[in-house]
Amino acid sequence: MWAFSELPMPLLINLIVSLLGFVATVTLIPAFRGHFIAARLCGQDLNKTSRQQIPESQGVISGAVFLIILFCFIPFPFLNCFVKEQCKAFPHHEFVALIGALLAICCMIFLGFADDVLNLRWRHKLLLPTAASLPLLMVYFTNFGNTTIVVPKPFRPILGLHLDLGILYYVYMGLLAVFCTNAINILAGINGLEAGQSLVISASIIVFNLVELEGDCRDDHVFSLYFMIPFFFTTLGLLYHNWYPSRVFVGDTFCYFAGMTFAVVGILGHFSKTMLLFFMPQVFNFLYSLPQLLHIIPCPRHRIPRLNIKTGKLEMSYSKFKTKSLSFLGTFILKVAESLQLVTVHQSETEDGEFTECNNMTLINLLLKVLGPIHERNLTLLLLLLQILGSAITFSIRYQLVRLFYDV
């Protein structure tokens, strides 16, 4: 097994600077509180009885600290090349990958902050990560360009051992970036959840990278650690202020920043399949939410749980709509989901006609349906435990079940 002392010197420097980044994030967020409120980048917590103004878009602070850390860190992986005797050839491909990754993340932070300020529509939320992922795809094209995949064992009699996907591989990577940036944004709405799930995912990736340092792809995992270590500590600083009762909101800025950072290391670190497995709860939440996201079933602006003032606990939130406004497909999906105990449906009739009411289709509301009303802090902890369980399952698949599909 590797020892701490055997870690590359740039990684140790990265760790030290990241610890300073944690302190900076914890310090800067309250220091800028007044500036955000003065700029009207603030809002009220809908699940609290207090109507205190809370600063929003604080992900821009953790994102800025993250970028400063990595901008200052850029020379350290290439220190040997500052000494001519030790530098055989400058690793231009590594430098391009580092700069391209930072460009993609920087673009996503900027576009995420624009979303927080301008309150963009959902169709724009799909275009933003697509645009920000272009530098990432160009880096992959110029540095690697490999679009061949190893076919899983069950499909080899049909497709062979290797399959060249060509341009479809770039489409897959672009869709991965779009999914990662929006998946965290969809599973959100209660104190500490966005930053908490990102913290668990980043910790899981760090563990995975450290385990793989002895493997054949050591350089790829070292590259991933350059990003994941500072991301973990800056997110930890943000979570300190975002934990229940939240003193700040992370905003769409953080969700986009986190998602693009994960997409960057997954694509350029060549472990995108493992990355998707770490997103297991987010994938389930996305699939469960799809009927509302596609507006097959009416989707309100906010799908967060609602607070029962008497009990102080969160309960399911509902979407109410006229029954006749639901399409045949929507009616079919609702009936199937109800028969599978995935949604609660109520019918009512008023002077205006017949109405249907169903719980909003998110993982948060599904847990409340199964377990009943829960205190907000406990609900966040439960969701983070599910995220940890998802990571444990991912490691089991990656190091045990993978033998059923690939030669390892």
Curated annotation (Swiss-Prot):
Mg(2+) binds at N185, D252. GO terms for cellular component: endoplasmic reticulum membrane; intracellular membrane-bounded organelle; membrane. Dolichyl phosphate binds at K125, V178, F179, C180, T181, N182, A183, I184, N185, I186. It is a multi-pass membrane protein. Pathway: Protein modification; protein glycosylation. GO terms for molecular function: glycosyltransferase activity; identical protein binding; metal ion binding; UDP-N-acetylglucosamine-dolichyl-phosphate N-acetylglucosaminephosphotransferase activity; UDP-N-acetylglucosamine-lysosomal-enzyme N-acetylglucosaminephosphotransferase activity. Pfam families: DPAGT1_ins, Glycos_transf_4. It catalyses: a di-trans,poly-cis-dolichyl phosphate + UDP-N-acetyl-alpha-D-glucosamine = an N-acetyl-alpha-D-glucosaminyl-diphospho-di-trans,poly-cis-dolichol + UMP. Glycans are attached at N146. Changing R303A: Reduced UDP-N-acetylglucosamine-dolichyl-phosphate N-acetylglucosaminephosphotransferase activity. Changing N182A: Loss of UDP-N-acetylglucosamine-dolichyl-phosphate N-acetylglucosaminephosphotransferase activity. Its cofactor is Mg(2+). Homodimer. It is linked to Congenital disorder of glycosylation 1J: A form of congenital disorder of glycosylation, a multisystem disorder caused by a defect in glycoprotein biosynthesis and characterized by under-glycosylated serum glycoproteins. Congenital disorders of glycosylation result in a wide variety of clinical features, such as defects in the nervous system development, psychomotor retardation, dysmorphic features, hypotonia, coagulation disorders, and immunodeficiency. UDP-N-acetylglucosamine--dolichyl-phosphate N-acetylglucosaminephosphotransferase that operates in the biosynthetic pathway of dolichol-linked oligosaccharides, the glycan precursors employed in protein asparagine (N)-glycosylation. The assembly of dolichol-linked oligosaccharides begins on the cytosolic side of the endoplasmic reticulum membrane and finishes in its lumen. The sequential addition of sugars to dolichol pyrophosphate produces dolichol-linked oligosaccharides containing fourteen sugars, including two GlcNAcs, nine mannoses and three glucoses. This is UDP-N-acetylglucosamine--dolichyl-phosphate N-acetylglucosaminephosphotransferase. It comes from Homo sapiens (Human).
